[in-house]
């Protein structure tokens, strides 16, 4: 299942929330969303997940279980504020090295400042680049992580192929993303929370509900667990699996470069 489609006008289109936009239009629109929320991104995730994103991220790092080796290299994509990368570094006993890549400079600035305050900047690099065109050689990383970022990429299938390219043989892909709720009744509650409460909380916190409306809509347009797992396989990954969190509100996808 590809995220990119041919429009009635003959051009390539993709989703920006519930809107259909040209593939080249999506990234600037997404950038604008995250420029607006960069300084309050963690609060945004608390609102989006009712605080559960912290538990899900801890579970993601536990699944990765980074070893305490200085030659262990992780690429964390769409990780601007450093939330995942910091957890990886700490879990490894401050031995592993994480490269934080994001297309949004505002997010990276927040992450770099947080790293300095934590005293772990020596374990981190911050790189402004596009997930669809990674500025790294093939077979460079032991792991590739992305949390709540893949749905914002205009061409998801291209980003997954790039992930495969830069991973070493035996390297692991981990994708944490909001997903399709599979628990009866929870889906109704989550829809009500998403479309009624989240934009209102967003406006209260930041003065602007538009970024939160987009983020809610982008979750609904993202492929379900099985369709996304198929996309990961199509990119070349083996031993593909997923684990639902909180009834499917989020899911952790895993794949290996064999």
Curated annotation (Swiss-Prot):
It catalyses: a 2-demethylmenaquinol + S-adenosyl-L-methionine = a menaquinol + S-adenosyl-L-homocysteine + H(+); a 2-methoxy-6-(all-trans-polyprenyl)benzene-1,4-diol + S-adenosyl-L-methionine = a 5-methoxy-2-methyl-3-(all-trans-polyprenyl)benzene-1,4-diol + S-adenosyl-L-homocysteine + H(+). Keywords: Menaquinone biosynthesis, Methyltransferase, S-adenosyl-L-methionine, Transferase, Ubiquinone biosynthesis. The keyword Transferase applies. One of its GO terms (molecular function) is 2-methoxy-6-polyprenyl-1,4-benzoquinol methyltransferase activity. Pathway: Quinol/quinone metabolism; menaquinone biosynthesis; menaquinol from 1,4-dihydroxy-2-naphthoate: step 2/2; Cofactor biosynthesis; ubiquinone biosynthesis. CDD domains: AdoMet_MTases. S-adenosyl-L-methionine binds at residues 81, 102, 130-131. SUPFAM superfamilies: S-adenosyl-L-methionine-dependent methyltransferases. This is Ubiquinone/menaquinone biosynthesis C-methyltransferase UbiE. The keyword Transferase applies. One of its GO terms (biological process) is menaquinone biosynthetic process. Pfam families: Ubie_methyltran (PF01209). Its EC number is 2.1.1.163, 2.1.1.201. It comes from the Bacteria. It is an enzyme of class 2 (transferase). PANTHER family: 2-METHOXY-6-POLYPRENYL-1,4-BENZOQUINOL METHYLASE, MITOCHONDRIAL (PTHR43591:SF24), METHYLTRANSFERASE (PTHR43591). The gene is ubiE. It comes from Rhizobium meliloti (strain 1021) (Ensifer meliloti). Belongs to the class I-like SAM-binding methyltransferase superfamily. MenG/UbiE family. InterPro entries: SAM-dependent_MTases_sf, UbiE/COQ5_MeTrFase, UbiE/COQ5_MeTrFase_CS. Methyltransferase required for the conversion of demethylmenaquinol (DMKH2) to menaquinol (MKH2) and the conversion of 2-polyprenyl-6-methoxy-1,4-benzoquinol (DDMQH2) to 2-polyprenyl-3-methyl-6-methoxy-1,4-benzoquinol (DMQH2).
């Amino acid at each position: 299942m590809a995220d990119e489609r041919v429009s009635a006008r003959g051009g390539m289109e993709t989703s920006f929330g519930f809107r259909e936009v040209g593939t080249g239009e999506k990234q600037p629109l997404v950038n604008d969303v995250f420029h607006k929320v960069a300084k309050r991104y963690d609060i945004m995730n608390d609102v989006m997940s009712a605080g559960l994103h912290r538990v899900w991220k801890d579970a993601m790092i536990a699944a990765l279980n980074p070893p305490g080796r200085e030659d262990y290299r992780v690429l964390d994509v769409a990780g601007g504020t450093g939330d995942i990368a910091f957890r990886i570094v700490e879990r490894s006993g401050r031995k592993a090295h994480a490269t934080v890549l994001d297309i949004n400079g505002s997010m990276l600035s927040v992450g770099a400042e947080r790293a300095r305050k934590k005293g772990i900047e020596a374990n981190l690099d911050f790189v402004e680049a596009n997930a669809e065109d990674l500025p790294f050689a093939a077979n460079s990383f032991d792991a590739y992580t992305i949390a709540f970022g893949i749905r914002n990429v205009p061409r998801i299938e291209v980003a997954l192929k790039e992930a495969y390219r830069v991973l070493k043989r035996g390297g692991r892909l981990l994708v944490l993303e909001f997903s399709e709720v599979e628990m009866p009744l929870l889906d109704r509650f989550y829809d009500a929370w998403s479309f009624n409460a989240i934009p209102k909380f967003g406006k209260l916190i930041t003065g602007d509900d538009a970024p939160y409306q987009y983020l809610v809509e982008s979750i609904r347009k993202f492929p379900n667990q099985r369709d996304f797992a198929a996309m990961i396989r199509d990119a070349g990954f083996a031993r593909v699996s997923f684990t639902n969190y909180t009834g499917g509100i989020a899911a952790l996808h895993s794949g290996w470069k064999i």
